[in-house]
Amino acid sequence: MAFDYVRAAKYFVLWDFIKGFALGMKYFVAPKPTLNYPHEKGPLSPRFRGEHALRRYPSGEERCIACKLCEAICPAQAITIDAEPRDDGSRRTTRYDIDMTKCIYCGYCQEACPVDAIVEGPNFEYATETREELFYTKEKLLENGARWEAEIARNIEMDAPYR
């Protein structure tokens, strides 16, 4: 009999409505879990693999020694390298192209590079209007490296204990 009184009291007090309203107010005042993307950006992992870049030494010399390990290990065959010897006996690239339409962003090129010349940087916003813009030349890759060098160096330093 007491159970019927409790059930009737909950019915007349609109207990289910009050519980639902309280739950709605809880989420109304809580911080939003979503980001307003173009204006707000979430954090990226130091291991994030984005747009490719070629790095230079602090002296300004290109890091790439034209060993062609990245070209050999690329499963998509997206990298093309031509090299020639210099006067001091070392090799330097004359052509370093990446076909981004073929690239699968596996990161093997970055792992294979003995001098950390080719890296996948933190930039993920590189949509283009034409397909030709996705064929990266050596100049474009060096420009990306110059633009993102500080962040790339920080990410490599943070990832160093795991390499």
UniProtKB/Swiss-Prot annotation:
It is a peripheral membrane protein. It is found in: Cell inner membrane. InterPro entries: 4Fe4S_Fe-S-bd, 4Fe4S_Fe_S_CS, NADH_quinone_OxRdtase_chainI. GO terms for biological process: aerobic respiration. [4Fe-4S] cluster 2 binds at C74, C103, C106, C109. [4Fe-4S] cluster 1 binds at C64, C67, C70, C113. SUPFAM superfamilies: 4Fe-4S ferredoxins. Keywords: 4Fe-4S, Cell inner membrane, Cell membrane, Iron, Iron-sulfur, Membrane, Metal-binding, NAD, Quinone, Repeat, Translocase, Ubiquinone. GO terms for molecular function: 4 iron, 4 sulfur cluster binding; iron ion binding; NADH:ubiquinone reductase (non-electrogenic) activity; quinone binding. It is an enzyme of class 7 (translocase). Its cofactor is [4Fe-4S] cluster. PROSITE patterns: 4FE4S_FER_1, 4FE4S_FER_2. The keyword Cell membrane applies. This is NADH-quinone oxidoreductase subunit I.
